Amino acid sequence: MDFPQRVNGWALYAHPCFQETYDALVAEVEALKGKDPENYQRKAATKLLAVVHKVIEEHITVNPSSPAFRHGKSLGSGKNKDWSRVKFGAGRYRLFFRYSEKEKVIILGWMNDENTLRTYGKKTDAYTVFSKMLKRGHPPADWESLTQETEESH
């Protein structure tokens, strides 16, 4: 999947924080395909990549404002409330995104990997890691900076 692109009427962008994780997953799947072209589709990374595409194309871009994507207070309150997240991969993976209904834009902010699976109370928990990223400003918390940083990377 290349970014930016238009999906279900939404302009879909990938922030560098998401793009880095996504590209690593794509590279892993391509390496698996090179090693074992007949069986790579059975591997966990290949299945995960397929689920990521499905989540983006059939869930996020269909209704980004769905109540199912609200994170409650998992990222704290205040300025992080505008981030949404989708759960997948047996509840261990999270893909965080922001959207603007007015602009019809969705920005994929970050997706955790096998090193940051959802594990309550751990330093490597997806919410803990993403909260720290937001505190450091990468990705930025405000829409204007997020949009600018995302556009500069494409």
UniProtKB/Swiss-Prot annotation:
Please name the InterPro entries in this protein's record. Answer: Toxin_endonuclease_YhaV (IPR021679)
Pfam families with a match to the protein in the record: Toxin_YhaV
Q: Signal peptide: which range, if any?
A: none
EC number, as in UniProt: 3.1.-.-
- Look at the named UniProt entry and state the broad enzyme category this protein falls under: hydrolase
Q: Does the keyword Aminoacyl-tRNA synthetase feature in the UniProt annotation? A: no
Q: What does this protein do?
A: Toxic component of a type II toxin-antitoxin (TA) system. Has RNase activity in vitro. Acts as a transcription factor. The YhaV/PrlF complex binds the prlF-yhaV operon, probably negatively regulating its expression.
* Protein name per the record: Toxin YhaV
Q: Which organism is it from?
A: Escherichia coli O6:H1 (strain CFT073 / ATCC 700928 / UPEC)
**Annotated gene:** yhaV
